[in-house]
Every structure is written in structure tokens, then in C-alpha cells.
Amino acid sequence: MAFWQSKTLTEMTSQEWESLCDGCGKCCLNKLIDDETEELYYTNAACLLLDHQTTSCQHYSDRFRYVPQCTVITAQNVHELTWLPDSCAYRRLAAGRALPSWHPLLTGSKDAMHLAGMSIQGKVVDERRVKDIEDHIVLWPLKDLD
């Protein structure tokens, strides 16, 4: 039985926890919250550190030096991070759901995730090039498969 099936999120080692991240990059997108409805909207404006092809942070280990507001996702706060997409492995496991069939822990690489359209690859712009963030609202980050 795989570690994510036999352990709770809080029982996982830091290496196991980190490996749960599929690297889709959706959590690195700028998001907006409607002041009146409190509805969350994703944009295609990506963090300046996000590599648009590999969908990985270019400075993950020292990202807070560049982006102090970057959020650390932990077993303790994952339930509060309602802005994480439904496809996020952390959110799925916290809700008692299984990893999706395209997850790199199941497939051995990010290829299936990219082919399934579940990553930011080829869909984003650098946040520094965005003038009116409202013009960049997108729905595709909300997509969830199996």
C-alpha cells in the first residue's frame, strides 16, 4: 500500500509530503476574490518565479526571499486553504479522495498531467506583464478529473 493510502497527512515525512505536490502550478496563479460575493476567481497570471514550461518554481527552496507572500501548504493548514484547486493532491487527500489517475506518483512523470490539461503549461502569462488582472480571469484551473 502506498504511503498516501496508509498514512494521514500529519503522519507523512517532509519528503512524502513534498512528493504529493503534482507540480501543476495552479497554486502559483494570481487569484481574485469578489468583494461582494466572496467568490474566488483564478487568473492566468502566474507568479514571476513559475517556469511556464516545466510548471515548477525556479527558486523553490528560497522562494520567500523573492515572494514573501508565497504560502506554505502544510498538513495543518491545508483545510483552511480553500483557494487550492479541487484537483490538488493535498486538497483531495484532505477530503478523503484518491489521487487522480494522471498524478505523477501514479504515472512516474508529469507527462500525463500535462496531456490531461491539468497543469498551467502553455496557458499562462507572467504576472509582471499584466495590466488589468480582471482581464485575465480563467475557468480552466477549476477543472478536475476523476
Curated annotation (Swiss-Prot):
Q: Which InterPro entries match?
A: Puta_zinc/iron-chelating_dom, UCP006173
Domain of life, source organism: Bacteria
Pfam families per the UniProt record, alphabetical:
CxxCxxCC
Q: Which HAMAP family match?
A: UPF0260
The entry sums up its family as follows: Belongs to the UPF0260 family.
Protein name, UniProt field: UPF0260 protein SO_2573
Which species is listed as the source?
Shewanella oneidensis (strain ATCC 700550 / JCM 31522 / CIP 106686 / LMG 19005 / NCIMB 14063 / MR-1)
